[in-house]
Amino acid sequence: MQSYFNELEQVRYEGSQSTNPLAFHHYNPDEMILGKRMADHLRFAACYWHTFCWGGADMFGANAFDRPWQQPGDALALAKRKAEVAFEFFHKLNVPYYCFHDVDVSPEGASLQEYLNNFAVMTDVLAEKQAASGVKLLWGTANCFTHPRYGAGAATNPDPEVFSWAATQVFTAMNATRQLGGENYVLWGGREGYETLLNTDLRQEREQIGRFMQMVVEHKHKTGFQGTLLIEPKPQEPTKHQYDYDVATVYGFLKQFGLEKEIKVNIEANHATLAGHSFHHEIASAIALGIFGSVDANRGDPQLGWDTDQFPNSVEENTLVMFEILKAGGFTTGGLNFDAKVRRQSTDKYDLFYGHIGAMDTMALALKFAAKMIEDGQLDQIVAKRYAGWNSELGQQILQGKMSLEELSRYASQHNLNPQHQSGHQELLENKVNRYLFG
């Protein structure tokens, strides 16, 4: 079949002095960072949905892109053409992974049986493409939010028949992900929330989604899927309030249903800021709670209150993110998926490459600077010194439950405690970070 991106052979590393816009300037896959290849640290993935499914429409305008696979015609044939172009893109971009929703890669059809038949065909097509290209599946998921049946949610829907349809989609998408060697399976509750409490039973819906997640875990173990299950937090949009609001909320939900050892989180930068947090905060929180899994790398617009899904371009922001990830030992099954799309006015097909190349260079620089921070160790030393008192006999007795509130009160009185505030040195630390970044 004719190449779609026929003016490009493959994006390669050419160094920071290159002026070629279709080359990497900082991302060198084989460069060794802290004893590991850069590619193995970053584990880049391109997403199917924004890159090959979005037609450029927004709330005020129709599709703006002229994609051959988005024209009228046989849906299954167009899906196969889209797969051809997608894997050409993955290969030429030199990304090791990709991600998809079920209906990104396969036509939904007019019935449940058509959905199942189409997805089975396209799973075989994807398997062939993976084998031929060497590109692997980072994670799969099911779209249980776009179809009108999911207007009131999927797992939280008041109709158990809708719940059952969603269960069928997740069951099928999990099986496809396992068949394709996917390293994770993601659950995003796009409409698992409410518009108004006037028609919502919060306890009922929480019990429903809790049971749904338990069934997902049960199916994982029954089938022997070795990947990681991930929930992707988001506070709102499309619903007014969503139950997977942020990392801390997800952790509380997992604890309630006994799933905190079974499910981790896939953190998206733009979702973090919509929740009123920094991307750095959500990453650090997930690591502290032991549920860090994977990342959707993108950014929002601080002047806009919705999910703009722009490509990441802040080295400063992402250096702190990569610093946390490196300190925690790096990714295991997760990676950096670019859940990002070109702007509606970016109608040149090579804009898809420009967006991803810039994002990959951004994350590569962030990795390099984070590695410098790790190697230097000054930030960790300052933090360790700040909390050193908790390694003392008093601190350890408190943490180990060897002192009651009454005993602590007696200790403070007997030792005439008069602790003095010690500086947090925030400005000093910020200056140190800037020196890592800018010299």
From Swiss-Prot:
Cofactor: Mg(2+)
Keyword vocabulary terms for this entry: Carbohydrate metabolism, Cytoplasm, Isomerase, Magnesium, Metal-binding, Xylose metabolism
GO biological process, one term: D-xylose catabolic process
Catalytic activity: alpha-D-xylose = alpha-D-xylulofuranose
Annotated cofactor note: Binds 2 magnesium ions per subunit.
An example Gene Ontology molecular-function term: xylose isomerase activity
Binding site for Mg(2+) 1: 232, 268, 296, 339
Record-level GO cellular component terms: cytoplasm
Active site, per annotation: 101, 104
Subunit structure: Homotetramer.
UniProt-recorded name of the protein: Xylose isomerase
Organism of this sequence: Yersinia pestis
Gene that produces this protein: xylA
